[in-house]
């Protein structure tokens, strides 16, 4: 094309009138003409593509308003696909050398219709030869008997789709056939419209109504741009079948059934279909981005380290005052005593809790008064998740998760998991892509070792989208599944496969339902706004549920019950209207490294025999409790970060024997950990809400397998007493640990720091509660309070810098032995009337009050303690009345004599002693040794939290 020629716009206008052969010839003139022909993409190539009667819009039926990237390329793909059925034409010719000189026979075109060469399809087929083209002109063609295709032919309808209707039952016995632009309806004598057992059939731009299509292996088929109205495609043992850009409407049963393992025998078309699939654009993401950091909640600093505690006295004064003396009414100390409540507990007046490493240094005193400083370091919370994320939550601020908690993309997950990548790239059995299934009963049913792959489809307004049973495998990539009247995807009887990158929402039952030993990989899906749960695992179902977004579902985001045993890792489960994860009815599961946030009920709810392993999760910003362990719930709760929930961090029943260890529980609205034992009536189900009714299948009663796997799980160690150990419990709105239980409880090696009420409150404990080797510091009121009629043993604890008393007790059997009670603003120990306490071998110090204060007729044995004098105006020991039941034996009282006096806690060093008792979270267990339906959860708001129920959350 010369520079002085016509403008390009004028050339495009001229070339727009050319037909396809002429465009091809023009593109061969030179490179300039070739590029000019390519530039006609949005004009002439678009007209040719949409004007072709053998195809429809390239993005029909799912996105008919979205233009393809290239109309020319789309037209090219249509043309090449229309020729697939003849690929073996040369193979059927004679292979002897003389065939090279034989004149090739031209394909004939046979016309069928009124006034044409043939009156019926049957008569035309009787005269057809290999690869002839039979054209049906507009009209209705009804065949009274079964048509048998004995030679490869092409049957095409003339005119617009719908003008040629064929009422027939066709049985293909030849190697290949193509049918195009036809409307099929079944003949009067058979519902089967088309059947093939060994050959290849290709349907393009056809409509099928109210009948069946059957393809048996080693037969194959390729179906494109077809509409199926109440029509069932049955694929039995097919090695490969391709359904593309099809619409399935109004099915009374399944739209597509894939049955049987793909046949090992393959016909000639298998390799061509496989090549066509591999050359087509993939639905797998291709972005090449760096891996994001994986969630790692176990990389924490050491919880604490042994320390030496120095008590440094500055100033001088005469020795101690008499033990029975009281402070002067006008003194500063007298005003501090006025802060003691009616029960003898000191109430802090300052609004903030101390987080500092040093104890109070007399900030309320005048500068000319003597100063007393405690130079030890108080153990604070363990840092987790790096930095400021776990600071005080800001009201109204948006939630910004650290980069290490951001979900990986599907491509990143597949690159990390080579087996999943190989599975995603595999093609076997039936490939269904870019199809629309709507307004019917079922979408795709895969059974009896069948194999099916679904990419880029839409399933809507069905009873269910996909069912996979009896050792079958499905691969589902980038599908939309919504408004199903039951579950979206249903797997049972050892079904499996890969479910990745799908958008599953607004379904009446679970988005994904896994039962009876099914074991799929569920990866990088969005499962949301379901009318019930997001994912349900029950009846010995398994599965790996990883890196999904599960949100805004009406019931639990993930429901595990009836021996369900999945591995749930790396998911974001948020904004659910019930619990984030619920484990009921003997459900198990390994639940690790998930972000569970902003759910209306408990982040994780464990009840009725549920026994999961809950490890290294972030459970935050919930509108109720972080973790709920209800009636008969068990399990290991280890290494989790439970943060900023409006209820308790952990609410549990001690009768269930939960094991709560190595968790970081902070900034929750109520208690850090609350332990109860009273039954809440949750074992009673209201009428009409039985489990069988909630999860029944097609109205049938469910008989679940009751065989349990051997309890040799290395993730759990057997315990016989409820255990709270090695946790960091800090900055919670009420007490760090609240106990109201009639069962025994062990509280061991925890850091309980800077909580808004007491460190530990024991309100009820008819069986012994053992509190050992804990660091209890900087809490807004007392370090430990024991109510009346409670049995508590306090041993080996460090109780430092609390704004009330160190320990205050009304209990009738309290043992305080070998503790360090140092630097608290109230008395070290406050023994209230009618209490019975043994105080043995403790080291006790208070800055502003008494070392030990005995109120009324308290019964006490105070023996072999070291009691340091605090403020100069206070005595070491105070006894309000002459109480003969208070026995003092072999105690050592230390008072300062001169400014340089220094006391050190060195033999033994400052408590708690944790070097031998600290447990770290055990290593993640990747194997699947965790085992399958829970009753419906119903919310009930209780009037008060102290009714011994989990706040906002109860199982009815």
From Swiss-Prot:
GO terms for biological process: apoptotic process; protein ubiquitination; regulation of apoptotic process; ubiquitin-dependent protein catabolic process. Residues 314-367 are annotated as: Disordered. Changing residue 825 to W: Found in a patient with lymphoma; partial loss of function in controlling the stability of BCL2. The modification Phosphoserine is found at residues 321, 326. It comes from Homo sapiens (Human). It holds the Pfam family NosD. It is found in: Cytoplasm. Pathway: Protein modification; protein ubiquitination. This is F-box only protein 10. Keywords: Apoptosis, Cytoplasm, Phosphoprotein, Repeat, Ubl conjugation pathway. Changing residue 212 to N: Found in a patient with lymphoma. The keyword NAD does not apply.
